[in-house]
C-alpha cells in the first residue's frame, strides 16, 4: 500500500508518466546505449523479431534506447502479422510483462496463428532480402556496402546483426 501511495505521489509531483511506469516495472531490460538488442533471428515463443522488439520497448520506457526505435518498420512486421498496434504491445511492457508473458499475450491477442503459421512467417521474415524490393533497393545498398556486405545476397536480419556488431565494436 505504501509503495503504491508513494508511487502516485511521485507521479503527481513529476507529471512524467514514463518515470511513473519505470518506477513500477519489474523487468528493466537492456541498456541499448551500451549493448545491442537481441538479434531479430532470436526466436521468443517461436516468433522472430519478438525478443528485439521487447528489448527496444523496455529500453524506450527506461530512457536508454539510444539510436534504436520502437514501433519501427521491423517491429511492424511482427505487429502486422498478428494484427496488433505498437501501443497495445507497449502497454503490456509497461505493466512489467516478462518475455514469457509477452509470448502468452501475443498468442492470445490479435489474429490467431497456429504454431505452423508462426514458424512459416518467422522463416519468411528471416529470409527477407530488401534488395529484391525495387522501392527499397537503393536505400538498402547504401546501408550494407559500408559494412562490406553484398546487397543482392544479404538478408535484412544479417545486415541488422552486422550493423549492431560493428556499431558497438566502434563504441567500445
Predicted region positions:
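Polar/charged low-complexity regulatory segments
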Residues: 26-65, 125-171
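Alpha-helix boundary/N-cap detector
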Residues: 41-48, 69, 73, 77, ...
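Amphipathic alpha-helical packing elements
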Residues: 64-106
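Amphipathic protein-protein interaction modules
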Residues: 89, 93-147
Amino acid at each position: 500500500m505504501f509503495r503504491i501511495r508513494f508511487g502516485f505521489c511521485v507521479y503527481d509531483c513529476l507529471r512524467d508518466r514514463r518515470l511513473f511506469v519505470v518506477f513500477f516495472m519489474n523487468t528493466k531490460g537492456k541498456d541499448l546505449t551500451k549493448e545491442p538488442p537481441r538479434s531479430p533471428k532470436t526466436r521468443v515463443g517461436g516468433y522472430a523479431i519478438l525478443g528485439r522488439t521487447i528489448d527496444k520497448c523496455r529500453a524506450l520506457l527506461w530512457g536508454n534506447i539510444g539510436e534504436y526505435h520502437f514501433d519501427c518498420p521491423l517491429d511492424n512486421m511482427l505487429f502486422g502479422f498478428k494484427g496488433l498496434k505498437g501501443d497495445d504491445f507497449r502497454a503490456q511492457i509497461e505493466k512489467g510483462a516478462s518475455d514469457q508473458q509477452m509470448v502468452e499475450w501475443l498468442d492470445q491477442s490479435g489474429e490467431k496463428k497456429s504454431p505452423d503459421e508462426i514458424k512459416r512467417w518467422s522463416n519468411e521474415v528471416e529470409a527477407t532480402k530488401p534488395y529484391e524490393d525495387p522501392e527499397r533497393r537503393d536505400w538498402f545498398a547504401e546501408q550494407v556496402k559500408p559494412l562490406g556486405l553484398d546487397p543482392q545476397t544479404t538478408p535484412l536480419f544479417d545486415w541488422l546483426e552486422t550493423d549492431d556488431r560493428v556499431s558497438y565494436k566502434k563504441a567500445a
